[in-house]
């Protein structure tokens, strides 16, 4: 029952005190099972039906869906349960102890983004869920900070089709309706080693990579010329060469060279389209040197995302906040939730605090966030 729910600050404190770090390095990676159990128990106390979904391909990670109300449509409030690892030497406070000081709540996940669930639970104290005309769903996902496996799997497997969704990432309560995607690849070239005194007896992978880079830079120019979205600060897809390694000695013909690169596509560009453009760009090298060039994903790709600017969700939220929706360059789970329904990214705290030592959320966000959650529930679930 509602009177069993702890006070807002104690909910917040318990969430921060429950570690749920996501990391590609197995030694740092943690299950989110304890955090999911916390959330599930609280939502059950509020009368929600709760489903816990194991996420395949992860190290004991789970999604949670809490639901109440009947019928079609309704509202989905979503967020991720995991945090990034922390640099112990750069934190001046215990990352897992919620600390309030000078108008700020400090702790790992205060802004990005465990705190959003505390706001939802607190707002629901004043909502009679038995009187909702449409369903209300709360989604807590796993592994957003690494593979986004939780949101991907939920979107692939659910039959839910809400009217709209809000993902509570830290946007300083400024609504976001679009962002770029992210694709990161490793270009690997396998040459043939040999003594540098006889170049004809080897195939220098660095020289082949030099040729490949020239074609990749031509692709970068093509992306800049062909695709535009003026609302973005950088209004075209970017392509970055971020890391390269090859060879082991100055007197040996380089046998292997590897380049890491990324592309940040605009909304509307498909992953198949981008893969085709990259493969076409590298085709001259592949054709000249069959079997020596490969392209592999470094991370699962994230498509760009856009909520239609004239959708009711945009109009309602802009009116409630008195602020226009924005577009941003960072990535969220929105592309996957958007496959289910129109989606906005909107939550308390600043994105500038995400992944930072001494992460905090300013207490000035508490009242307006609680009010906003109550208002959107009333608008989309009561009418």
From Swiss-Prot:
| GO biological process terms held by the UniProt record | L-arginine biosynthetic process
CDD domains in UniProt = M20_ArgE (cd03894)
| Role according to the record | Catalyzes the hydrolysis of the amide bond of N(2)-acetylated L-amino acids. Cleaves the acetyl group from N-acetyl-L-ornithine to form L-ornithine, an intermediate in L-arginine biosynthesis pathway, and a branchpoint in the synthesis of polyamines.
Q: Where does Zn(2+) 1 bind?
A: 80, 112, 169
Catalyses which reaction(s)? N(2)-acetyl-L-ornithine + H2O = L-ornithine + acetate
List the disulfide bonds in this chain. none
- Pathway where this protein functions: Amino-acid biosynthesis; L-arginine biosynthesis; L-ornithine from N(2)-acetyl-L-ornithine (linear): step 1/1
Q: How does it assemble?
A: Homodimer.
Q: Which UniProt keywords apply?
A: Amino-acid biosynthesis, Arginine biosynthesis, Cobalt, Cytoplasm, Hydrolase, Metal-binding, Zinc
Which cofactors does it use? Zn(2+); Co(2+); glutathione
Instruction: Kindly report the protein's main subcellular placement as a broad class.
Output: cytoplasm
Q: Which GO terms describe its molecular function?
A: acetylornithine deacetylase activity; zinc ion binding
Tell me the Gene3D superfamilies matching this sequence: 3.30.70.360, Zn peptidases
Q: What is this protein called?
A: Acetylornithine deacetylase
Q: Where does Zn(2+) 2 bind?
A: 112, 145, 355
Where does this one sit in the cell? Answer: Cytoplasm
What organism is this sequence from?
A: Escherichia coli (strain SMS-3-5 / SECEC)
What protein family does this chain belong to?
Answer: Belongs to the peptidase M20A family. ArgE subfamily.
Q: How, per the record, is the cofactor bound?
A: Binds 2 Zn(2+) or Co(2+) ions per subunit.
Q: What is its EC number?
A: 3.5.1.16
